[in-house]
Amino acid sequence: MLQADAGLATQLIQKPKLHNSGIFHWIYVGDTALHLAAAGYRVEIVRLLLASGADPNAARNHRKSAPLHYAADGFITGPAWDAKRQVATLRCLIEKGGDVHRADMNGATPLHRAVRTRCAAAVEFLLKAGGDPVARNKSGSTPFHLAVQNTGRGGSGEPAAIEAQREIIRTFLSLGISPKLKDGAGKSVMGCARSMWIREMLVA
């Protein structure tokens, strides 16, 4: 289909809101086919679209989210979850020019969004790819601050999500990032931690 009409690679989605049961992500007006493929971790389609001229940094939807943001999102307790495919999709986008530092309308980078949705493997990969662990979103939170809070995303409270949260916190600590790190309001990572098990991890 792309060989017959290369313009499909850059065509914008027109429906106000689209939800596909096989892809656990909302798609909005202004998104491209690459957003849809990235959200579903369809790495083979991502490669094909990029080779056909799709822009890895396109962000014309109302949330100013690029395909890399969608690939960084996840629902780890959902039926379509696949951590390996997620990382492969992120790698493909970054290798073709996806900006790991790009912020959406809320100031969230792909790393913020991977942390928020408890995608531990994606967090580790994005950090290795140059993601900034101390970048602040518009609320002033760094990815490390989000790691110690209940974000209401990624199956929060479920055993798999809690274990992923532990892994993410360990990853930040292994990089030597201090729990004393302040957010935009001057609050430390430790000060944002409410659960005792998280506080114990931060002081260990």
Language-model features: locations:
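Ankyrin repeat domain, specifically the short helix-to-loop turn at the C-terminus of the second helix
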Residues: 2-8, 14-16, 47-55, 91-99, ...
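Ankyrin-repeat boundary/"N-cap" motif
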Residues: 11-33, 59-77, 103-109, 136-152, ...
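Conserved ankyrin/ankyrin-like repeat signature
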Residues: 44-45, 85-89, 121-122, 167-168, ...
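Eukaryotic tandem repeat interaction scaffolds
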Residues: 86, 99-139
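Ankyrin-repeat and related helical/solenoid repeat scaffolds used for protein-protein interactions
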Residues: 121-124, 128, 132-185
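Leucine-rich solenoid repeat scaffolds
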Residues: 173, 178-204
